[in-house]
Amino acid sequence: MTSILYSGGDIFDGTGELLKGHAVLVDDDTIKDVAPAEKFSDYQGERVDTSGGTLMPGIADCHVHLVYKGEADPRSSIEGVNPGEITLRVLENAQLSLKSGITAVRDCGGREYLEFPVRDACNSGRFFGPNIMASGKMICMTGGHGNRNGRIADGCDEVVKAVREQIHAGSDLIKIMATGGVMTPRVNPEDAHYSAEEMNAGVSEAKRFHKTSASHAQGAEGIMNAVKAGITSIEHGIFMDQECLDAMMERGTY
């Protein structure tokens, strides 16, 4: 068993004030104890001095697109790029996240499921990386936000089919585009894209197979359509109003 004691700096455990004069004992990559440093006065194993720093839990980033590197024009950055190269970029971005203190990410839309093998490799411990949840293809309407890389579906039956396709491909959650967005030409971010009926069909099918769901939703009407359908989380929510907030609070929507 390999053990390491981290001591000297502050500790933030996510539940209250900074802990001072405490130490963290790690055995085989598992935190075994967090206690006042005096408790470990007789410790004979490896020590790491964290003086001047703060230890804290890993951060979960709930909305990433691992195929991109934060470019101003993300679509152009992968257009015409070999799928193998894109997969390597996904792995690089995942590993950079972990090196930055992000221990879990939720990928909310990738490219032809190239992120799935990276997810599996990182989650299994085969490669260094964070825990990854991945949605697969974003489900969107014809001409809607995300249509260039997403799964286009129109009407309730087609939306249900699209959800089933993502589940079959191995998606951890379902991503549905409720409104327009700023990265798609000639699309108004405030416009509702899917109708209330279409949103309900997609979210209900996700729930039927025990999947959480996320909705790109910026305009108030689209946000309400998603919330009333039972969506797990609203992504962005730029133009939400008090009615949207009240509905989210009532339903426990993130």
Regions found by a protein language model. Give the residues of each.
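Active-site core of metal-dependent hydrolases
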Residues: 180-254
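Divalent metal-coordination and catalytic microenvironments
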Residues: 9, 24, 29, 52, ...
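Active-site gating loops and adjacent loop-to-helix segments of metal-dependent hydrolytic enzymes
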Residues: 65-86, 95-98, 128, 136, ...
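Divalent metal-dependent hydrolysis catalytic cores, especially in the metallo-beta-lactamase
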Residues: 89-115, 128-140, 171-184, 212, ...
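Histidine-rich, glycine-flanked metal-binding segment
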Residues: 2-5, 11-56
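Metal-associated gating/positioning segment near the N- to mid-region
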Residues: 53-124, 197, 229
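Short, acidic/polar
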Residues: 86-94, 154-166, 218-222
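Active-site gating/metal-coordination segments in enzymes
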Residues: 143-200, 232
